[in-house]
Amino acid sequence: MSNLATVTPIKPHLEVVEHRVAELDDGYTRTANTLLEAVMLSGLTQHQLLIVMAVWRKTYGYNKKIDWIGNEQFAELTGMAPTKCSTAKNELIRMGVLTQVGRQVGMNKNISEWKTKVNGFGKTFTRSVKLTFTKSVKTNLPNQSNTKDNIQKTINTNTPLPPKGGCDEGSKPEKRKPTKINYSEYLAAYNEIVGDRLPHAVEVNSERQRKLKKLIDSLATKNIDGFRAYVKAFMAAARPFHFGDNDRDWVANFDYLLRPKVLIAIREGTL
């Protein structure tokens, strides 16, 4: 007689899956709609937007206006590295979106103080160039109709005569005298704009004169006004790294702004 085999049924492994559902009973954050809409229109970067939301969570989420929030807390809430959290937070403070009192930060509800797109400070490069280009093209384009007639009318059939009292050959245009640069004025303008945030420039040596002259020739407005605009643009675009927030204790200075690549970075928005 054959032995009967015992068959044990195999049951599938059942794992309990928890479905997480957001509920107001678990807590909520009250935010003014005007503030929310202003943030959405401000053109903030992803890192900056995450920091704003983290500040809301740690302040408005606990019915506070301001609180101390460490970089580690920001990192836990946003998933970013603490150093990136610090950089984005400092950028928002400089832009006036966040306020800082000591080590505490909070949201600046006075939207008119923000230096962002919502106030017109951040008009995009593409749009501004497009408007300028369109206007200049409409102004400067010649009338293209009746091209054949226009060409014939512009042909001068008269024999050109030499100017009275002068010679028609060998005359050369008078050379323009180069504008003398007051280098001390440029250093003073730089020191005034950077204030106490960057080291001041004192000495006007030959190397600085040479580099400054080259920089001025590269500016759109080749005078002290163009230089002041350049320094102001740098201060607005500079990151905490440029003000000493780095491992080397390095800070930007007057000679750093004389570098051609810094001017290019300011123009292209890649500083």
UniProtKB/Swiss-Prot annotation:
Q: Does the keyword Transmembrane helix apply?
A: no
| Pfam families for the chain | Phage_rep_O (PF04492)
Q: Which InterPro entries match?
A: Phage_lambda_VrpO_N (IPR006497), WH-like_DNA-bd_sf (IPR036388)
Gene Ontology biological process: DNA replication
Region annotated Disordered, chain positions: 141-178
Question: What are the Polar residues biased-composition ranges?
Answer: 141-159
What's this protein's name?
Answer: DNA replication protein gp18
Keyword tags = DNA replication, Early protein
Q: Which family does it belong to?
A: Belongs to the phage O protein family.
Is-annotated flag, keyword Endoplasmic reticulum?
no
Entry superkingdom: Viruses
| Lineage, broadest ranks | Viruses, Duplodnaviria, Heunggongvirae, Uroviricota, Caudoviricetes
